[in-house]
Amino acid sequence: MHQTNFGFNKVDYTKKQWLVNNIFSRVADKYDLMNDLMSIGLHRLWKNEFIMQIPNLNSNILDVASGSGDIALQLAKKAKARGNNISLILSDINEEMLNNAKKKSIDLNLFQNMKFIVANAEELPFLDNSFDYYTIAFGIRNVPDINKALKEAYRVLKPMGKFICLEFSKVKEGILKDFYKFYSFTIIPSIGQIIARNKEAYEYLVESIALFPSQDDFRIMIKASGFEEVHYKNLSGGIVAIHSAYKI
């Protein structure tokens, strides 16, 4: 039977999605707080940089692995301020996370141009050539078959549509690399235990980050899925990177 990584452990391919889904269900109520604490607020700056990759907000946008909706909500807020006609579909395999996003959109009065769909990134329930942009932030490393998800991204994008991915990456510099490793494997799981009462979930988080392909290797994977003009931009010394590509 086909196996894949769940953190540093090997599990059956069919079991990984259930395990990942279970983790996010258990930490859903503390998800936003944990993001702020773990990244010392940096995730907000990274996401601001990420949405700048979308200059045209008069667009159909698919946000995959939406989680609690940070990316889509920022885009909706920006479009509303500009008077743009944006259409957003928030998709996530975890219904509890998506419900959190829906509640936030209602509280912020940003729900008007949004749809919320529980879906698997490997088998998206959308027609070919449907979207101007495909966004995914801190989600693709949790997909059991990343190559399959990339091919689905290519399929649902319109010709000249843009793929944009924000993901943890590989730190290059020596001192920062050593500190980041210590912080990831020691501090983050401890914060997870104190705040979310779930050390194991955040051990999985840091292990999944450690196993995710390097910037250049992920670039090769994106290109192999059919995309052109594949580029990446490191943020915070390579702690995260923004990957972008076009369907041509």
Swiss-Prot record:
Q: Which domain of life is it from?
A: Bacteria
Protein's UniProt name: Ubiquinone/menaquinone biosynthesis C-methyltransferase UbiE
Reactions the enzyme catalyzes: a 2-demethylmenaquinol + S-adenosyl-L-methionine = a menaquinol + S-adenosyl-L-homocysteine + H(+); a 2-methoxy-6-(all-trans-polyprenyl)benzene-1,4-diol + S-adenosyl-L-methionine = a 5-methoxy-2-methyl-3-(all-trans-polyprenyl)benzene-1,4-diol + S-adenosyl-L-homocysteine + H(+)
Name the lineage. Bacteria, Pseudomonadati, Pseudomonadota, Alphaproteobacteria, Rickettsiales
- Please state the pathway this protein functions in, per its UniProt record: Quinol/quinone metabolism; menaquinone biosynthesis; menaquinol from 1,4-dihydroxy-2-naphthoate: step 2/2; Cofactor biosynthesis; ubiquinone biosynthesis
What are the recorded GO MF terms, alphabetically?
Answer: 2-methoxy-6-polyprenyl-1,4-benzoquinol methyltransferase activity; demethylmenaquinone methyltransferase activity
What does the entry give for GO biological process? aerobic respiration; menaquinone biosynthetic process; methylation
**Known EC number(s)?**
2.1.1.163, 2.1.1.201
HAMAP family reported in the protein's UniProt record: MenG_UbiE_methyltr
Q: What class of enzyme is it?
A: transferase
Q: List residues binding S-adenosyl-L-methionine.
A: S68, D92, N120, A121
Q: Describe its function.
A: Methyltransferase required for the conversion of demethylmenaquinol (DMKH2) to menaquinol (MKH2) and the conversion of 2-polyprenyl-6-methoxy-1,4-benzoquinol (DDMQH2) to 2-polyprenyl-3-methyl-6-methoxy-1,4-benzoquinol (DMQH2).
Question: What are the protein's UniProt keywords?
Answer: Menaquinone biosynthesis, Methyltransferase, S-adenosyl-L-methionine, Transferase, Ubiquinone biosynthesis
Q: Name one Pfam family in it.
A: Ubie_methyltran
Protein source organism: Rickettsia typhi (strain ATCC VR-144 / Wilmington)
InterPro entries given in the database record: SAM-dependent_MTases_sf, UbiE/COQ5_MeTrFase, UbiE/COQ5_MeTrFase_CS
- Family listed: Belongs to the class I-like SAM-binding methyltransferase superfamily. MenG/UbiE family.
